[in-house]
Amino acid sequence: MSNESIKAEQDLIQEGVESEVSTAEASLVDELTQANFRIEELEQLLADALAKVEEQKDSVIRAAAEVDNIRRRAAMDVEKANKFALEKFANELLPVLDNMERALMGTNPEDEATKAIYQGVELTQKSLLTAVAKFGVKQIDPQGESFNPDQHQAIGMQPSADFPANTVMLVMQKGYELNSRLLRPAMVMVSQGGPSQETATIDIEA
């Protein structure tokens, strides 16, 4: 076989190899292109899915917050209703307690004829005060205490050698508070002090 024949055969083989390589490269490029398109599609699907998840998550969070707000408002409404009902009950109870107080003041505990009545009213009053104290109702009896305008209402002032100035010398009507909130101030007479003391003055509500 001549050199020319050998060269021609080699060229033919090389062309065949190059053709195969070219075809393989084209096929690979096509596969890679399709793979890239598929990857982009999957990435878009993933992004859409994540967006939906975030949207649903946000909806769940908003719904949970709304439920929490509704629950909180309902609890506040119940608390307000309970406070209103308790305050109304306590205010309606004050005249009963006042009547018991007046009955005790008008009855002589040393008189055998009225001693049993006095003891009965006193026991009933104590039992009632103990019962309402469980609901936060507390009696204000400031006898001998310093005048407190937040809890006491002065109906007058008098000189007194027995009580320092601005001291409650007489409780005309006891006050009451509900859970540390004033229901009614105590009606009191306030001392101006003795003759040697400097005269004290306070606002007196008519």
Swiss-Prot record:
Alphabetized Pfam families for the sequence: GrpE
Predominant location category: cytoplasm
Keywords on record: Chaperone, Cytoplasm, Stress response
Biological processes annotated in GO: protein folding
GO cellular component annotations of the record: cytosol
Keyword Heme in record: no
Keyword Transcription (UniProt): no
Compartmental location: Cytoplasm
GO molecular function (one): protein-folding chaperone binding
HAMAP family assigned: GrpE
NCBIfam families from the UniProt entry: PRK14139.1 (NF010737), PRK14140.1 (NF010738), PRK14150.1 (NF010748)
Quaternary structure (record): Homodimer.
Role this protein plays: Participates actively in the response to hyperosmotic and heat shock by preventing the aggregation of stress-denatured proteins, in association with DnaK and GrpE. It is the nucleotide exchange factor for DnaK and may function as a thermosensor. Unfolded proteins bind initially to DnaJ; upon interaction with the DnaJ-bound protein, DnaK hydrolyzes its bound ATP, resulting in the formation of a stable complex. GrpE releases ADP from DnaK; ATP binding to DnaK triggers the release of the substrate protein, thus completing the reaction cycle.
Family: Belongs to the GrpE family.
Protein name as it appears in the record: Protein GrpE
Organism ancestry: Bacteria, Pseudomonadati, Pseudomonadota, Gammaproteobacteria, Alteromonadales
